[in-house]
């Protein structure tokens, strides 16, 4: 698979690149796949720095909820469909997202009260722990029109399910078996994944970025490269929130029975 290039008005060649992003202990970890054998990784403290660096990317796929309920809906349709395609216990990794108004709460208790008032459901601890990151991405998308077509939501377990031809991962991603299972799949779909992961593990301390964060971001980047013209979404026809942001989870499915080659970007 050849990577496209385009020329700007000044004649400079710009390679079409895809970026996969996942939140990590020190901010945001990203993987950029540029062209065959050319990749970059890094960590940024906030999401605006990622957008500033990669705003010319073909796509930025991020593991964070985009498109938030305001009231009346306790669960997005995309989250329900994601749980439906995943086997137990992977489906438990998809948890309800907070309503937009709860993102500004100062405490977990306050966020729970706000969320229950507008959606009828308290907030999970998992949702509260990423509320700050959800707010970062939400604020960026609402203030940059172009970002809305570039920064898109993914969920790692859905990505691996799709890359694995509709079969969920068998092991928890934080276990050794789970790490190896996911790495084997990524290496099959994108030869060179092992080198990317090995180099990243050698470069950054685990207190900065976890091993599972690296795998999740790489899965997003590989998905963006493999399916850049044919990404699918859950649901097929996404709902939009009150600000116009899509409530969707993107993926690229390698169909069962097909002779799907490994992705050579």
Describe each PLM feature range.
Residues 3-6, 11-19, 23-265:
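RNase H-like (RuvC/DEDD) metal-dependent nuclease/polynucleotide-processing core
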């Amino acid at each position: 698979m050849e990577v496209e290039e385009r020329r700007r008005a000044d004649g400079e060649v710009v390679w079409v690149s895809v970026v996969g992003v996942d939140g990590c202990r020190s901010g945001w970890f990203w993987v950029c796949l540029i062209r065959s054998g050319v990749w970059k990784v890094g960590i940024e403290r906030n999401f605006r720095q990622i957008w500033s660096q990669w705003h010319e990317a073909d796509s930025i796929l991020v593991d964070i909820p985009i498109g938030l309920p305001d009231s009346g809906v306790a669960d997005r349709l995309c989250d329900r469909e994601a749980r439906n395609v995943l086997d137990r216990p992977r489906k438990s990794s998809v948890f309800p997202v907070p309503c937009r108004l709860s993102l500004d709460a100062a405490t977990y208790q306050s966020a729970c009260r706000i969320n229950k008032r507008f959606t009828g459901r308290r907030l999970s601890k998992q949702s509260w722990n990423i509320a700050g990151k959800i707010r970062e991405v939400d604020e960026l998308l609402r203030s940059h029109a172009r970002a809305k077509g570039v920064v898109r939501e993914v969920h790692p377990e859905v990505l691996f399910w799709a890359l694995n031809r509709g079969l969920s991962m068998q092991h928890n991603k934080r276990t050794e078996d789970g790490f190896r299972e996911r790495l084997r799949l990524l290496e099959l779909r994108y030869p060179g994944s092992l080198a990317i992961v090995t180099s990243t593990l050698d470069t950054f301390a685990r207190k900065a970025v976890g091993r599972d964060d690296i795998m999740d971001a790489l899965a997003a980047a590989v998905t963006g490269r493999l399916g850049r013209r044919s990404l699918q979404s859950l649901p097929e026809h996404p709902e939009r929130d009150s600000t116009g942001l899509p409530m969707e989870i993107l993926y690229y499915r390698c169909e069962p029975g097909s002779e799907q080659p490994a992705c050579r970007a």
